[in-house]
Amino acid sequence: VTGVQTCALPICRSSTQEELTTTIIGQVLFIFILVMLFTSYLSLFRKDYFDKPRSITMLYAMITLFPIFVSLMMKHNFFSVYIIPFAMAPIFVRVFMDSRTAFISHVTMILICAAAVKYQYEFIIVQLVAGLVAIYSLRELSKRSQIFITALLVTIASSVVYLALQLMQDNQVFNVDASMYTYFTVNGIFLLLSYPLMYIIEKMFGFTSNVTLFELSNTNKGLLRNLSEIAPGTFQHSITVGNLAAEIANRIRANSLLVRTGALYHDIGKMTNPVFFTENQAGVNPHDQLSDLESAQIIISHVSEGLKMAEKVGLPGIIKDFITTHHGTGITKYFYINYCNAHPTEVIDKSQFQYPGPNPFTREQAILMMADTVEAASRSLNEYTEESISNLVNKLIDGQVADGFFKECPITFRDIALAKQVLIERLKAIYHTRISYPHLNVRQNAGKKTS
């Protein structure tokens, strides 16, 4: 090594060090801007996620873990980064949260990963298309086959987009790197792991997927089977309420599967004292032997008893919320009014007749409260005409609005108006008038032959 070369070595090292430092600073700045933009999106459009620590944790974990995997693979020259199933992240966010957040988080994650990848333009385009296909092909996860179809579509879409990009650059089919299609196939196979991993994430972060809701709505096992045997009247009421609530949810674009499942479980606490509820009584009313205050306490207790049962079998929190909110902080009006009439001079503690609450804080919970109240009250009508049903529905729901039951949930007046419309339509169909068939008189000559 000559003297000139010896002097040049420190200069080369210094130049390389400066380039490396500059690159790192640029990457950190780039990532910081992307994370801030993603946080701004959440604070502007999905502020509710900040009230759910597990949701926020999962979102930031997704946009952090995948870039770490990419950096490690690039640093140690492992397999191609194209075998990493990046589309898995938007699948999880889509299933447990929403489509828009799934796409925004996916874009953020891919752009961060691109900072460590060669041929960034190609990588970004292929992965963005793969993510979009995954999101739109998996709108509602209700069957295992959907994951397989999604993995297949993502593999095909990635392969076609890569081929298109290569043709635009080289104009030669034969110059396309065939090994890339092997990577895309492996990527699709890894994407199938989304299904078992989904269960782990669900338990880890406390989410509830559609698959779990379908399993919980099976009426042939568990609490629902017990409900059908111990309190058959309540069971039928719950099914009817679930159908009404699901119809409303479909009309206002809420989660119909969630509200139907919640409706099936909302009255499970009645199994403790089934005969104290009118739908399970067979002529004898045990409340006749009790004071109004005692009766009110038994009726109110079905909420706390239902919550105990739900916790015992490990029902998800999102279902337990339907149990606690379906009466809100309302009162047992029948027994409260009776007590007031019987004790006109007494200063009455209203809280003794009041449900513990809380009031509904989601649209689905508000839907259940409306459907439950209307269905129960509809059975007390003397006649089922369009006018009587319409008056009942409007009176009950307007009363709930006036009492402030829906102040804590994001339901609109338009949603409530549509809910009324659905309830009136469905109750008219349930209690439609039937034709009275004529009585067939016995004909004396019916069996004789005529000559």
Name each region found by the language model.
Residues 2-9:
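Short, small-residue-biased leader/transition segments that mark boundaries at the very start
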Residues 11-34, 46-53:
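Cytosolic-side membrane-insertion boundary helix
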Residues 32-33, 188, 192, 365:
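Residue-level signal for the membrane-embedded core of alpha-helical transmembrane segments
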Residues 43-235:
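Generic detector of multi-pass transmembrane helix bundles and their immediately adjacent loops
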Residues 91, 95, 110-114, 131-136, ...:
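Generic, well-ordered alpha-helical scaffold segments in large soluble proteins
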Residues 173-183, 190-205, 209-258, 290-293, ...:
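Long, compositionally biased intrinsically disordered regions
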Residues 222-386, 399-403:
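Divalent metal-dependent catalytic cores for phosphoryl transfer on phosphate-bearing substrates
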